[in-house]
Regions:
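Residue-level detector of extended alpha-helical repeat arrays and alpha-solenoid scaffolds
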Residues: 45-48, 76
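HEAT-repeat alpha-solenoid elements in large eukaryotic scaffold proteins
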Residues: 34-42
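Short inter-helical turns and helix N-cap capping residues of alpha-solenoid HEAT/ARM repeat scaffolds
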Residues: 71-72, 103
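Compact alpha-helical subdomains of small soluble proteins
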Residues: 98-155
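Bacterial Sec-dependent N-terminal signal peptides
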Residues: 1-26
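Short N-proximal segments of mature Sec-exported proteins
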Residues: 72-87
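Amphipathic alpha-helical scaffolding segments comprising HEAT/armadillo-like alpha-solenoid repeats
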Residues: 30, 57-67, 88-100
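Core register positions within helices of long alpha-helical scaffolds
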Residues: 51-54, 82, 120-126
Length: 158
């Protein structure tokens, strides 16, 4: 008797949880910034960086969490950056939820150098033990095994 009730309860909880995510309403200010940002294509370009700073200033933590699942990779990455900047305690959980976010990439600009990065890679490096300012960044001991898991080099055969 307990098992059908438990299954029903879990299913109902999941259904409510999913419906809340789809019906989540961003504030008017956040919507405007996200709309502007979603037209950009390069992270760290001067235009998109200014929009990121606006997003950091207007979006609540809940909105940023929601935006880490946005359809545009640049919005997902900047929302993740903003959560790192705000020292969101569950930032690693969000990273792990993006382990399979490897289909789309983002263009990243560093001065005159431009490159592409998978969303998962971008988020992983945002938690780098040396360069991240987040309280919840990885330690070197935590970082290295994850790095090896995702980015191990194929050794040439002799």
């Amino acid at each position: 008797m307990k098992q059908p009730f438990l299954i029903s309860f879990i299913f109902t909880t999941m259904l409510i949880s999913c419906s809340k995510k789809e019906n989540y309403e961003l504030s008017k200010q956040t919507k405007l910034v996200v709309e502007e940002l979603s037209h950009d294509s390069i992270i760290f370009s001067s235009g998109s960086w200014n929009k990121y700073l606006k997003l950091l200033g207007v979006a609540s933590t809940e909105e940023l969490i929601y935006l880490t699942s946005h359809k545009k990779p640049i919005v997902r990455c900047y929302a993740f950056d903003a959560l790192c900047a705000k020292d969101y305690p569950k930032i690693r959980e969000i990273f792990y939820s993006h382990e399979n976010d490897t289909i789309e990439s983002v263009a990243v600009s560093a001065g005159d150098i431009r490159d592409r990065s998978l969303v998962r890679t971008y988020m992983f490096l945002a938690l780098h033990p040396v360069t991240s300012s987040s309280k919840y960044k990885f330690s070197r001991k935590e970082f290295n095994p994850i790095f090896k898991k995702y980015y191990k080099r194929i050794q040439p055969k002799n």
